[in-house]
From Swiss-Prot:
UniProt-annotated location(s): Plastid, Cyanelle
Keywords, sorted A to Z: Cyanelle, Plastid, Ribonucleoprotein, Ribosomal protein, RNA-binding, rRNA-binding
Main localization, broad class: plastid
Gene behind this protein: rpl2
A molecular function (GO) term: rRNA binding
Record-given protein name: Large ribosomal subunit protein uL2c
Origin species: Cyanophora paradoxa
PANTHER family: LARGE RIBOSOMAL SUBUNIT PROTEIN UL2M, RIBOSOMAL PROTEIN L2
Amino acid sequence: MAIRSYKAYTPGTRNRTISEFSEITKSEPEKSLTFLKHRKKGRNNRGIITTAHKGGGSKRLYRIIDFKRDLKLVPAKVAAIEYDPNRNARIALLHYQNGEKGYILHARGLAVGNMVYSGPNAPIEVGNSLPLSEIPLATEIHNIELTPGKGGQLVRSAGSSAQLLAKEGNYVTLRLPSGEMRFVRKECYATIGQIGNAEISNISIGKAGRNRWLGIRPTVRGVVKNPVDHPHGGGEGRAPIGRSTPVTPWGKPALGRRTRRTKKYSDNLIIRRRK
């Protein structure tokens, strides 16, 4: 994927860059694999904001992605590579030999016309899904299951990949993109290769309105709010926060406080915490 920049015709285009979308081969999604999903806008079932800075944005059709790859031993042909507004990775449309269709995450190097397979005897090639026990050491993988048969949960964003480091007993050792090293059961499936569209991290938004198209609302600093809205708020003029350390809107310590729950079931599976 190449990145296209704009000339400074307006302040909004001065620093704006976009993807060229040169790898996209089909503009309209497969209708049978889409549905209109209600957007929560950061609210819970009572209408109370639980996630800030969300709301608005363009309407989207949700594409049903096959994270399980449960059509074992059925060859599939890559029919198209499509844009997905719900994620930063591209998606690949598969036509299975039994007549079914499905979407998977597009792996780097996967092209239209390629054949992909899923199962313990699948070849070690980009886009194929195998149990971790059958994947060679040092292989780059993505879409990794945490529970056998549940579907891929780890390493699903653009440009990311994990590495298989070791196999011992019923577990394999993985190095995740965050730097975390952990055990995963060897029966779990993973897909070979790195997810494409890695250059997405180099794109410059350029203007505030483009974030609004994406459904991202402005982030207001706590120090400019009223005391009723934030512990940092209030005061006459430009006042300091009035505390020894910054806190969240709910009064919990911010900036550096670890937020992972203690005594979590997976603590004994993590060899080294993320960096």
